[in-house]
């Protein structure tokens, strides 16, 4: 272990609980974005973002309008994004200044469950509790919105935005091209999709489920393989080349090859 950062120890006086609710890292591991929610579930809950270097030295902190629900960071750390329960998607520059916020049509009644940014910073994706998947330009112009079959649990986007993916609580994975056309919808109504990951080119996609499975798909949405890990798969990630997939279930981290278990 290189270091730990105790966000609760850095919380202002009067905050009784601080939880990590978003985490991202840049390409070379020199910048870490952490999203915290203070006093979650209370009337005073609030969100704050930290950008740290790899020592860890805090480069900046920025408060946002509501609890943090997921965070993303571009490869060069020039673009940071966060989703919030206040119904907004936030985009920040490398100095922690909020460049823009995009409000969902329902505002606070349409919480943003998750947000991510493409590695090159050219696309921001987000998913809402009210079953919408949103793609935005760097200037917060909405390119398209997809209505999904259930609340969005996770999203992923390739480097250039040529492929994006969403996983829903209703058990569906949607794979889309850069025009918002659904290439394929893969349905597993017997479970929920909890985690999504995609490689740089969009040629390899991974999904983790509540019933303990990891699925891998190609860029056309054709399933390459699946493996059962046991407990709920809460996170997955795919490396740039698509030949390594990591997944977490319970207190265990699994490393899989891109070709399967």
Task: List the predicted regions and their residue ranges.
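Blade-level signature of beta-propeller repeat domains, shared across WD40, Kelch, NHL, RCC1
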Residues: 227-261
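Short loop/turn segments that connect beta-strands within beta-propeller blades
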Residues: 52-57, 93-97, 137-141, 177-181, ...
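Residue-level detector of Asp-centered blade-edge/turn motifs that repeat once per structural unit
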Residues: 27-28, 75-76, 119-120, 159-160, ...
């Amino acid at each position: 272990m290189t270091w730990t950062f105790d966000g609760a120890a850095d919380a202002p006086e009067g905050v009784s609980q601080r939880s990590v609710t978003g985490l991202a890292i840049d390409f070379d591991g020199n910048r870490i974005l952490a999203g915290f929610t203070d006093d979650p579930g209370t009337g005073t809950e609030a969100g704050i973002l930290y950008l740290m270097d790899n020592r860890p030295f805090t480069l900046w902190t920025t408060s946002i309008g509501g609890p943090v629900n997921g965070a993303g960071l571009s490869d060069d750390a020039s673009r940071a994004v966060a989703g919030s329960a206040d119904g907004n998607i936030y985009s920040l520059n490398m100095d922690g200044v909020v460049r823009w916020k995009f409000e969902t049509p329902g505002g606070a009644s349409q919480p943003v469950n998750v947000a991510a940014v493409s590695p090159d910073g050219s696309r921001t994706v987000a998913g809402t509790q009210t079953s919408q998947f949103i793609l935005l330009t760097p200037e917060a112009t909405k390119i398209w919105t997809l209505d999904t079959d259930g609340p969005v649990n996770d999203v992923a986007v390739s480097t250039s935005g040529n492929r994006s993916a969403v996983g829903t609580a209703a058990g569906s994975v949607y794979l889309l091209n850069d025009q918002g056309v659904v290439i394929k919808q893969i349905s597993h109504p017997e479970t929920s999709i909890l985690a999504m990951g995609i490689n740089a080119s969009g040629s390899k996609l991974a999904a983790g489920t509540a019933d303990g499975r990891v699925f891998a798909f190609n860029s056309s949405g054709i399933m390459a393989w699946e493996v059962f890990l046991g407990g709920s798969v809460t996170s997955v990630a795919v490396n740039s080349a698509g030949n390594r997939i990591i997944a977490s279930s319970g207190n265990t981290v699994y490393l899989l090859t891109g070709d399967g278990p």
